[in-house]
Amino acid sequence: AASYDAAIDAFNNAGSYKDASDKVIECTYKKAEALITAKKYDDAISILSTIEEYSDSQTLLAKCYYNKASELLDSGKYDDAYDMYMKSEFDDYKNKASECTYKKAEQYYKNKDYENAIKSYDNKDYKDCVAEKDKCYQALGAQAYKNKEYKKSVDYYEKVVKTDVSKKIANGKLAFANANKNAANETTMTYLGE
């Protein structure tokens, strides 16, 4: 990159000499290519942004965003990776952006942050998001049941789509009825659908 800097300076100092300004842009482009080869994507992005109209700079810029996003994804920076993929609009960027969201959801699930996992799994077109979301609802349902929040438990179980949880719903309703048998019968019966 240093040799390109020297060439750029030399052409800049050439003033209006024949093709000097074109050579500055060409050297700048070559410097960006060298930075990409060295995987210095931030520097390459910065340079390519100044010469977007030259040759295939826009395509190269998109590749830089994409490659930078891949690095961010690999390092677990899912939000930043998602943004960078979307900025790239390159190759399979939408699928890769969905992967970022999915991996973030997996992380939430692993940390038992089921509510945020559900929000992240909301992309129904990627992998097995619906099934993963179901696991979150089941975990929340079990948690609520354990805490004797039976109505809440049933509400979570009723959101499960792909798995038969009818027994868990019935158990939750029964537990709710037993817990509220001394409460106003009308409220309990209305909830139970009777």
Give the label of every model feature segment.
Residues 7, 14-15, 50-52, 87-89, ...:
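Alpha-helical solenoid scaffolds that mediate protein-protein interactions
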Residues 24, 61, 97, 133, ...:
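Residues that mark the junctions of alpha-helical repeat units in TPR/alpha-solenoid scaffolds
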